[in-house]
Amino acid sequence: MTHEEHHEAKTLGIGKAIAVLTSGGDAQGMNATVRAVVRVGIFTGLRVFFVHEGYQGLVDGGEHIREATWESVSMMLQLGGTVIGSARCKDFREREGRLRAAHNLVKRGITNLCVIGGDGSLTGADTFRSEWSDLLNDLQKDGKITAEERTKSSYLNIVFLVGSIDNDFCGTDMTIGTDSALHRIVEIVDAITTTAQSHQRTFVLEVMGRHCGYLALVTSLSCGADWVFIPECPPDDDWEEHLCRRLSETRTRGSRLNIIIVAEGAIDKNGKPITSEDIKNLVVKRLGYDTRVTVLGHVQRGGTPSAFDRILGSRMGVEAVMALLEGTPDTPACVVSLSGNTAVRLPLMECVQVTKDVTKAMDEKRFDEAIKLRGRSFMNNWEVYKLLAHVRPPVSKGGLHTVAVMNVGAPAAGMNAAVRSTVRIGLIQGNRVLVVHDGFEGLAKGQIEEAGWSYVGGWTGQGGSKLGTKRTLPKKNLEQISANITKYNIQGLVIIGGFEAYTGGLELMEGRKQFDELCIPFVVIPATVSNNVPGSDFSIGADTALNTICTTCDRIKQSAAGTKRRVFIIETMGGYCGYLATMAGLAAGADAAYIFEEPFTIRDLQVNVEHLVQKMKTTVKRGLVLRNEKCNENYTTDFIFNLYSEEGKGIFDSRKNVLGHMQQGGNPTPFDRNFATKMGAKATNWMSGKIKESYRNGRIFANTPDSGCVLGMRKRALVFQPVTELKDQTDFEHRIPKEQWWLKLRPILKILAKYEIDLDTSDHAHLEHISRKRSGEAAV
């Protein structure tokens, strides 16, 4: 791409105007989206307008439609709800209301609309778009607009972003606000768990979601609930019997509590609502357990947005502006959505149609189809939940095959959830499951024990590594490891860990030439806060670390805002990998993020200081700079702090903060719990297949490259990749993959921090079709 094409991005929007509004129920992350739309809009030369109070503001006009400035979206990122307000609007449903809205837009020269809201908001605006030409004709006929204004505003472009905590919109894996709502729910479930254990209580928790069970389903996976009621899959007719037996069995195995999650739209097979009170009365009557109901209500909509929602909102906001700038009269109204970790554009009406199809399927009691229509993510969650919650745990020990599970490397939140899932699904498949303490060192020393169903009870929500983890690699102890593999008859190995787990896998492959005992299938599940394991876009634990950094940055920004004219330099973990610094920079609204993957010079540091000097002249008198711990051996945190202190003398003062090991701790976030649970399940299923495949003459012999894999999330799917094939994609000296997907998000961070950069507009989402997308997902 030439410099001219790069430069074009800054002039793409000159002479055009865009209005941004939030509609329907509020959702955390909407403010991050509004901020991104405003700042990227201004960056490209657009005039950007806020529409306050949703569609009502569009109809009422006047002070409700105000031009936005760069500073007007400052300090919005960490706020829940929507700063520009939202309201349900009857007027907009009537043609008269839409006529007034069109008049208000034309008079301000606005021909682009960015709507952030739920499914109801989206259908309303599509009607508005299809009527646009007729509305303008009427306005011109009544003399309210001139012929020139009519020509200038001849067509209206609309882009939608789905902001809803329910995650009930088909076509996107996650809607803005869902992850934050899960944070609120899981925080409450964790808090309730301690009181429930103290009194041996059963808790029935009712969560939001209208007619979609996503929140309830993911919550049940994230906290290891005993039962979940969701509208998409009503329980069998004798569910009362099954539920009571399940609760009773759990207590018999030594559990002191029961957790039941109920979606607010839960129904039975006949469409009759199942309420929290019904369930409570049933448990009290049949089992006599002390049972309490907690209806979570609007707590789920509130609070600070999670790092995931801030990044999702920012990415979607940027993509929305690009979609509007590229729009033509023939472009269909599109929804910017998320598929895996990729931004995609989908035709609005296709998404609305599939969302309606789900409702129709549920009304007609075609529940299996409803689950399929909800999409790949929902189906995967449901399958794993059924495996873990609705299967009777095996009574007898011993089994078909012996699988061992271990943690390697530094602790990461979510490791325990992955171990729990691996152990329990292994037992369900009839295998004997061993746990290895202290990584490869423990495997060499024989620190191995058999795990039963209850061994991993309550592990999902616990941080760190309960098995113990060490960075020791297997190379020096291959002989002892081989001996213990034989001694304990280990036929498959699940290694959960970071870069050491991956390197250890390579060493085991290499050791096969010397020791036949090592010819057993193994799988590496990436779990590290650094997110630096080749073969996977995400690692277990990185999301929790990211949220920890975000929370700290929010507090530091608040301190800086109070002090005025202060810049904070914060050092994050990650080794040589700049994932945490970059993503936290995006989520916390940093002015700069220094990373190893993007080399920088003293001149770059100088430019950043000059940028902050200019910033102090505005109403935003504070700065936040992130530095990855190994981004440069000479430009250390102390060096950058000293440089900023000297160059900022008399203009701003500087402070530094090294976050350290707090980034490895804490309870895992819902994303990490859910991701770890699914990774463990997928790895165990693969392992069972590989062991059967490798069984010859009464023993396991696996020496093909595909018998030692990394299980990773690649764009839109979980895939197994042989460790030997990943060697060429690895920079071993710096312990990072040679190519990293998140580097393409760096320009967004710089634009949102008001840097004049060259933006490559060629790398954007293209319009896809939901039907094609779904048929392609079937194999996943």
Curated annotation (Swiss-Prot):
Which protein are we looking at?
Answer: ATP-dependent 6-phosphofructokinase, muscle type
PROSITE patterns assigned to the protein according to its UniProt record, in alphabetical order = PHOSPHOFRUCTOKINASE (PS00433)
Recount the known activity regulation: Allosterically activated by ADP, AMP, or fructose 2,6-bisphosphate, and allosterically inhibited by ATP or citrate.
Q: Which InterPro entries match?
A: 6-Pfructokinase_euk, ATP_PFK, PFK_vert-type, Phosphofructokinase_CS, Phosphofructokinase_dom, PKF_sf
Reaction(s) catalysed (UniProt annotation) = beta-D-fructose 6-phosphate + ATP = beta-D-fructose 1,6-bisphosphate + ADP + H(+)
Give the matching PANTHER family.
ATP-DEPENDENT 6-PHOSPHOFRUCTOKINASE, MUSCLE TYPE, PHOSPHOFRUCTOKINASE
Provide this UniProt record's keywords sorted from A to Z: Acetylation, Allosteric enzyme, ATP-binding, Cytoplasm, Glycolysis, Glycoprotein, Hydroxylation, Kinase, Magnesium, Metal-binding, Nucleotide-binding, Phosphoprotein, Transferase
Task: State the protein's purpose.
Answer: Catalyzes the phosphorylation of D-fructose 6-phosphate to fructose 1,6-bisphosphate by ATP, the first committing step of glycolysis.
UniProt: substrate binding residues: 164-166, 201, 208-210, 264, 292, 298-301
How does it get modified post-translation? GlcNAcylation decreases enzyme activity.
Query: Which family does the UniProt entry place this protein in?
Result: Belongs to the phosphofructokinase type A (PFKA) family. ATP-dependent PFK group I subfamily. Eukaryotic two domain clade 'E' sub-subfamily.
Which gene does this sequence derive from? Pfkm
Source organism per entry reads: Rattus norvegicus (Rat)
- Subcellular location per the Swiss-Prot or TrEMBL entry: Cytoplasm
Residues the record lists as N6-(2-hydroxyisobutyryl)lysine modifications = 557
Q: Where is the active site?
A: 166
What assembly does the database describe for this protein? Answer: Homo- and heterotetramers. Phosphofructokinase (PFK) enzyme functions as a tetramer composed of different combinations of 3 types of subunits, called PFKM (M), PFKL (L) and PFKP (P). The composition of the PFK tetramer differs according to the tissue type it is present in. The kinetic and regulatory properties of the tetrameric enzyme are dependent on the subunit composition, hence can vary across tissues. Interacts (via C-terminus) with HK1 (via N-terminal spermatogenic cell-specific region).
